[in-house]
Each structure stands twice: as structure tokens, then as C-alpha cells.
């Protein structure tokens, strides 16, 4: 049975304007905001994640922001558990949740569920896989995956490091290919919700301009200093999920090397810009695949989205 109140999912690539749109919608009705962003969960990572400021969060409170340290891990399964608990609590108070963000894996997990009995992550198994990658290269790790799970080898590329690690982790723990388990296992889907799905998909040229503006501002307001503070406060390394976030990965690599010349700094900024554009490209791909399965309304401009959502909820 569905709740009478809906769950609004507002998705879009990075820098598309979705957060500002959600905040405007928040002002117009009986809503609460839930962040769907794998980087915003981390404390002390503010500038590089374009996290709403304290003042903005006081005006527009977001759930699932600043909930763990950069040393901790937050999974899609944990997100679904936390989000469902928040949705139920909001509905009990007569509020309509707005889930806003760009982590499409989280949205997919919420909309479609997760395989119910895949094993949890095992730090020791992961460390062994990463050690093999460091010693022998990712091609050797990928070849191992192809040998034990050919179907996963077809789905993944050598560059899909996290997916390869997870697939091998599942195999080493269970002795079975992850693709076989995923095909066989039932999924826990929160059918009790009525999802209203909206996506901002701006023109890519315009989006790239917005990304450049965001990164330029990020450097200007002290992003490198933020990462330096993180290095001083936490025992960071590049394999932590938090440090795989775009911008942070490139800044950490730059700051941990001895050559911090202007040339290397510019190279780092260029790498961060390229990585952010690639992230947006992947987010577009995820959104298109979700649209093939679920009902969506898509908008090419923020103006178009504002007008339609005002009519629907304002």
C-alpha cells in the first residue's frame, strides 16, 4: 500500500542547479529535504562538495549531511536504510520529503532495491585486492575477475576499480560470482512509497560553463586550504571513499607530492575540471538508464523546472 504523501526525487548532474531548485520548492510548501550525495555525508568537506553553508542549512535544513568523518564508509545500503527511516518519520508528521542530489547509485537503490543477502564489505578482503592492484596493476585484478566471473568482465572495464573490487570481494567471501547472486536474489524495494521523479538535464555546453564557474570559485575561496586542514586532522589516503571524490582526489595527490610549482598546480586544477566533467557525463548516463525503467519528468532549464514544479506543488 502506498502512502498518501509522495516522495519527490529531484536529480541532476553536478552544478545543474538542483539544490537551489529544491530550496525554492522547500519555501513553497510542507516539505523537508534529504540529501542524496555521497560526498556531502562527510564532515569537514565543505568547499569541494559545494555543501550548503551553515546559514543556508539553517534556512533549508538538509538531512544526511555531515553525518560521518572522511575516514568512514557510507554505502548505498546504509543510505536506503537512513532515507527510508527519514521518509517514514516525515510522513508521520504530514511532511513531503524532497530527495535532492546527484548520486545516482543511491537513487537507483532507493527506487529498485538492493540484493538482500549480498555480503557486507570486508576490509581485509578489500585490502588484499588493493594490494594486488598496487603490486601487479589493475589489469591483473581485472583478469582475475574475468576468470571467476566472465559476465562481470563483460559489464566492467579495467577503469571500473570500485566495481571490480566489490565483485571480487563478493566472490572471495561467498565463492560465487556477484552477477549470479544478483540475478538470483530477491530485492528489498520500498514499494510503500509513491515516487515522483524529476531530473534536471541542462544543455551540456551550459553545464560545462557552470562546472568551470563552480571550480573557479572553489579554488578562489580556499579549497586547497580545506584539503590541507583535512590532511592535518585525519590520517587520509587516496583509497578512502571520501578522497575518491572529484577535486579531493586531485588536490590530495598534489599536496602530498614534493613538486608544488605553479605548473603542477595548474595541472591539478585541469585534472579536477576534467574529472568533474566526466562525473557529469556518468550522471547523465545513469539518469538515462533510470528513465528507461521509471517514470520521469525531465527539464532542460531551471526556469522550466521552476514553473512546472510551482504549478505541481506551489
From Swiss-Prot:
GO molecular function: ATP binding; tRNA dimethylallyltransferase activity
Domain of life: Bacteria
EC primary class: transferase
Binding site for ATP: 12-19
Cofactor: Mg(2+)
Sites where the protein binds substrate: 14-19
InterPro entries linked to this entry: Dimethylallyltransferase, IPT, P-loop_NTPase
Region of interest called Interaction with substrate tRNA, as start-end residue ranges on this chain: 37-40, 162-166
Keyword ATP-binding set for record: yes
Keyword vocabulary terms for this entry: ATP-binding, Magnesium, Nucleotide-binding, Transferase, tRNA processing
EC identifiers of the protein: 2.5.1.75
Described function: Catalyzes the transfer of a dimethylallyl group onto the adenine at position 37 in tRNAs that read codons beginning with uridine, leading to the formation of N6-(dimethylallyl)adenosine (i(6)A).
HAMAP family xrefs: IPP_trans
Family to which this protein belongs: Belongs to the IPP transferase family.
Protein name: tRNA dimethylallyltransferase
Species of the source: Acinetobacter baumannii (strain SDF)
